[in-house]
Regions:
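NAD(P)H-binding glycine-rich loop region in Rossmannoid oxidoreductase-like domains
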Residues: 2-60, 64
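Glycine/proline-rich active-site loop of Rossmann-fold NAD(P)-dependent oxidoreductases
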Residues: 101, 127-137, 144-145, 172-183, ...
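Mid/C-terminal beta-alpha module of Rossmann-like enzyme folds, strongest
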Residues: 167-225
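Conserved beta-loop-beta element that borders a ligand/cofactor-binding pocket
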Residues: 105-129, 134
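A short C-terminal helix-loop "cap" of Rossmann-like NAD(P)-dependent dehydrogenase/epimerase domains
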Residues: 114, 139-151, 206-211, 215
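NAD(P)-dependent short-chain dehydrogenase/reductase
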Residues: 123-157, 163
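Conserved Rossmann-fold NAD(P)-dependent oxidoreductase catalytic core, especially the SDR/UDP-sugar
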Residues: 42, 54-99
Length: 228
């Protein structure tokens, strides 16, 4: 957007305008950089699988101009995509049933072709001023439904990180990172979902309800995977 471009210009950065579906613009932008950080994704969840495939193409396009250069390419993914009955670690992989695996697969493909490509997995809560992520989604759901909710006892846990700490993790990955790595940018590692729902309940002055999985699908809809 123009507003975002102005913010970057004020910091002394040069703005290059591109589009996730304009692969030539992505190639041109990546070719002109000493390092590339990819954080863009179309969050229209009504077209989630389609958008995941578009992200695959975007990653492969940018990677194609970085082959053999050793210039770092950091691609953003998510910790919430990993499923395990224990705290997840960097060596865990995205499930085959998750369309978002397309991004991880693209990183592995271009790394095999000679690109210094790494994954930065962000937790479901990247919080701080200007938060546009999952917590605002939960707050809006509670406003719309008239209550905050968790599934069963809400003892599933979310990781979290402040947005400035996440930015620092990207910088360190560029400046000091090793070749073809996976990073988890985590500040707080074990926040019970029930505690998040309770805070939303208190903040909005609405009830807090425990839902069964079937009830949760009606309440959270596409977000159920992340709330479970």
């Amino acid at each position: 957007s123009d507003a975002s471009a102005q913010k970057l210009t004020k910091t002394g950065a040069t703005v290059f305008r591109g589009d996730l579906e304009d692969l030539e613009s992505l190639k041109s932008g990546a070719a002109s950089c000493d390092a590339v950080i990819h954080t863009g994704f179309n969050h229209d969840f009504s077209k989630f699988a389609e958008n995941c495939e578009k992200d695959r193409l975007a990653i492969e396009a940018m990677g194609s101009v970085l082959v053999g250069s050793n210039r770092p390419f950091i691609v953003t993914s998510g910790i919430a995509l990993l499923r395990a009955e224990r705290p997840v670690v960097e060596t865990d992989t995205v499930g085959e049933d998750t369309p978002r695996k397309a991004s991880d697969e693209a990183v592995a493909k271009i790394a095999a072709q000679g690109v210094n490509a790494s994954l930065m997995r962000l937790p479901p809560s990247v919080h701080g001023a200007g938060d546009h992520g999952f917590i605002p989604i939960l707050i809006n759901l509670a406003r719309e439904q008239g209550f905050a909710a968790c599934i069963d006892d809400g003892e599933n846990h979310w990781a979290a990180v402040h947005r400035l700490d996440a930015a620092k993790a990207y910088r360190l990955a560029i400046e000091q990172g090793a070749l073809n790595r996976v990073y988890h940018a985590v500040g707080e590692g074990a926040i019970a979902f029930a505690d998040i729902a309770h805070a939303i309940s208190e903040g909005l002055g609405v009830p807090l309800k425990s839902l069964t999985m079937e009830q949760a699908k009606d309440y959270f809809t596409w977000f159920t995977h992340f709330a479970a």
